[in-house]
Every structure is written in structure tokens, then in C-alpha cells.
């Protein structure tokens, strides 16, 4: 099967899973070449295609170049037979899907980064940031908990780009932050997350759920 394009990124990159999952549903092959952050994305060849030097970055076989993970995910979702499922069949369903994609990007992902970076050695613990970020994450999860009913997805009965984006956004959170006591507070969110990442069509992308018993606590 012909490659749909090349995705430049370090791995694991939480912003990439939604792209790869959308490709999987659309039966599209995306290649991920060897990549060294701070080297590959600073090369003259890379910058000639992607001036911002950011990843993920997508290049099609025709030379079409695209950056920003949501834009790449949208393009991949729209480029295959499951486009209407992933992006909606009409203006209202498409808007609902876009609503949740925006919610994850604006309300949850920055908070997850604040909480995860020091836990993986990419920053120092800051108590003020930690308290604020935990409160923001709790807010985001509470909104989701109220919206989700047991066993349902975000906007209907089938996986959409909203679900894939949400699962990608929360992947690191479940790996590092949302421990057993916290999961008990948001049973609908946990059930939805597991339903998405364990879906037969995309579970190969997300891998086995890596849920933690107790999150790491920073020293004051």
C-alpha cells in the first residue's frame, strides 16, 4: 500500500496518537522516520519545509507540508473513507466534534504538560504550579464526567476525532497523574478513555493502558 505521508516527531508524543489513530481508521499508512529532537528539526532541510521548526510535522508524497497536530489530524481524518464518522456528517455534528477538540486543546493539554514535565525529568517541581494545574485538571475532568454517560462516546456511538483527541490528550495524564484515588472520582471518564484506547481498530496505536496506582508527589 502506498504511503500517505511522512510524520516527523519524537516518540512518544501525546499529540501524535490522534493522528496515527485517525490514519488507522482510514486505512492510511504514515511513515515515522528516525528523528532526533533539536537536531533533525534544526537542519536546513527541515526548516526549508517547516520554518517554525516544530513537530509533529507532516509531509505528503506530493510535497504538501503541514504543522500543528490538530491540523494534521484534521487532514488525515478528512482523507479517507471514515471521514464522515471522524469529522461529522453535517454542520452540527462537525461543530460538536470541533467543540471537544478545542476543549481538550485549551482546557486540558496545557495543564497536563505542567503536571507531567517535572515528573519525566524535563523541569523542576513548583508547588504553586502543581496546585493550580491539579485544580485545572480536576475542572476539565469534572466537565467530561458530567457530559459522559456510562458506555458512551463524546458525540455519539462511533469514534470521532474528538474521542481520539481526548484520549491522546489524557494519555500522559493517565500514565503519570490520574492515579487510583483520582480515577474513583471520575468513573465515566475512565470508562470512556478505556473504551477509546481499547477499541479494536485503534488499540495498536495507543498500546496497553498504563494506569498508575499512586502518582509521584513533589518535594516542597
UniProtKB/Swiss-Prot annotation:
It comes from the Eukaryota. Keywords: Transferase. Residues 3-84 form the GST N-terminal domain. Its EC number is 2.5.1.-. GO terms for molecular function: transferase activity. GO terms for cellular component: cytoplasm; nucleus. PROSITE patterns: GST_CTER, GST_NTER. One of its GO terms (biological process) is translational elongation. Transmembrane segments: none annotated. Signal peptide: none annotated. The keyword Magnesium does not apply. Residues 90-220 form the GST C-terminal domain. Glutathione S-transferase-like protein; part of the gene cluster that mediates the biosynthesis of the mycotoxin fusarin C. Within the cluster, FUS1, FUS2, FUS8 and FUS9 are sufficient for fusarin production. The other FUS cluster members are not essential for fusarin C biosynthesis. Belongs to the GST superfamily. This is Glutathione S-transferase-like protein FUS3.
